[in-house]
Amino acid sequence: MVFDVEAVKMTDSGEQNKPEIEEIGNVASHTRQPEVISTMKPKGGVFDDEAVYKILKPSGQMEFQIEDNDVKPEASEQHGLFIKQGGLLFTMPIKDEDWKHAKEIYLMDNEVSVLPENPRCLNLSALFLPRNYKLRVIPPSFFDYMPTLQILNLSRTGIKSLPDSLFQLVSLERLFLNGCHRLMMLSPKVGDLEKLEVLDLEGAKIMNLPKEIKKLTNLICLEVSFYGYTGNGRRSMQSNAVVPCGVICSLSQLEELNIDVNPDDERWDTRVEDIVNEACNLKTLETFKFYFPRVELLRHIQWNSLSLSHFRFTVGHHVKRIMSRVPLDVEFELERWERCLKYINGVGVPRDIKNVLQHATAFFLDRHATVKKLSDFGTRNMKQIKCCVVGECNEVQMIIDTADAYGEDGISEIESESHDAERIVLGSLEYLYIYYMKSLRSIWEGPVPQNSLNLLKSLTLRTCPQLTTIFTQELLDNLCSLEELKVEDCPSIKSIVSCKIPAEHRTSYFLPNLKKISLHYMLGLVSISSGLHIAPKLEWLSFYNCPSLSNPLINEVSSHDLKKIKGERSWWEALEWSNGRPDYLDEIFVPIDIWDC
């Protein structure tokens, strides 16, 4: 049997947890008959309470997973009835009789705007109403007769407040209000929900937490977003503290604490040290999302006593941007990794940042004022880094300089390690995204230790006006895993390969797993690889505004596995061919859309 709810599965790939999102219900919406738009008794099986359980996403957020294979046919009679109408654009109110006998109700992704005034749901254990954006008001007595309700999901609805009857739900264990952008206040009566284990307010616009939160001693997950300003930029309903003193340390069972704040909120600056100190004394904390306006606050983290399997730290005071230069897909990439450090508007290379880097799997260096190389942070500190984003660091001239490996005693950091694995630089890195780097000239300077960057799968370079060198021969030898290369608005690049390859190697193919190349706004580009054979498995090519580029399909890239070529029609038709253009290439050519660039 298929249920209408998003299930998020976790699979383990090394250190990375990759979410597999299943839209359970797509199949059901095509197969079920109209009569199921009502309360119904399942044929051959019902939803099992144990099929809904807490799991941990890579970002640290609690989610619930509903598995079809957890449905137990023999449980039909004991579980009673349920309603499922997710994603059917259901707008009509459900009959009172249906509510009366339901055990679970799933009405997500609909256009529900009105709820019954006082439904009698004495057996209801789970109510899912997420993404009903037209739902603005919950009737005052709506929850009066739901004594067994354990899970309530009102995420991404238009509600502005919660009725008092909600805080009488003595059995409630999990309350989801994420993405409720109109919700700004949380009643002190929330402290009456003594059995509550999960409280998710991420994406709501809560002004402050009431001190009564400290009564929720069974809480294992707390997620909250604070926004200290109204839409017109003025402070509204400010209290002295976003989180009252003693609240966090009272929640001794917390395993997950995610706090998102407006960096302009001065209240956070005055309370942040106390909050981080309380959080770092929680013995059970495993997932921690936090904004540190000052680097020195990181010293409160005692890595020997904390067991953080997931963290997402943003460090450095900054103004929240209305428009970000970081594309959404890059933000999503950063979210994929379980331990992420964002360092914004930094100066120098603080030891506290280096300490966090040793535990991080993702690093975002944003608008650093003085650093000249990424390797200034220490290559040994970045052994676990799998995702790296570097942007708007105006002084950075190169990414890695192996000369930085030499310490004060003159012994190389690389040479000082006895084991081969210890000599590798960025050996775990899989994703590298570099953008708006006005002084960047090269990716790598100096010798390239064997297996350095050998796991890199995706490389993107955007708007680096002085960049002249991307790949040297040593780098080419190591990039055996590279699958995708994007270079955009780097006008000084003449070829992505900037080296002379010995004659005996010119017939060999480099970048053996490269499948996708995108070259846009490359005014100085003359050739892709200076005549070197690359990418024998290439499947996708995209060009735009590369006026000097000669035909790369003759002697540089393989066309055997090509599935698509994108470019300007005028450029394509002007390409010169020694024996005429093969017909099959015309079949896979697609004129590029300017919005693709």
Label for each model-derived stretch:
Residues 1-69, 73, 578, 588-597:
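Homotypic signalosome interaction modules of apoptosis and innate immunity
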Residues 4, 11, 16, 48, ...:
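Surface-exposed helical/coil interface segments that assemble multiprotein signaling complexes
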Residues 85-88, 108-111, 269, 342-347, ...:
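Eukaryotic beta-rich interaction modules
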Residues 94, 113-120, 137-144, 154, ...:
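Recurring C-terminal helix/loop segment of individual leucine-rich repeat
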Residues 99, 120-123, 132, 143-148, ...:
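Leucine-rich repeat
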Residues 105, 127-129, 149-154, 172-177, ...:
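Conserved hydrophobic beta-strand positions in leucine-rich repeat
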Residues 110, 132-133, 157, 180-181, ...:
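Conserved "Asn-ladder"/turn position within leucine-rich repeats
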Residues 348-350, 372, 404-407, 461, ...:
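Extended, non-catalytic interaction/assembly segments in eukaryotic proteins
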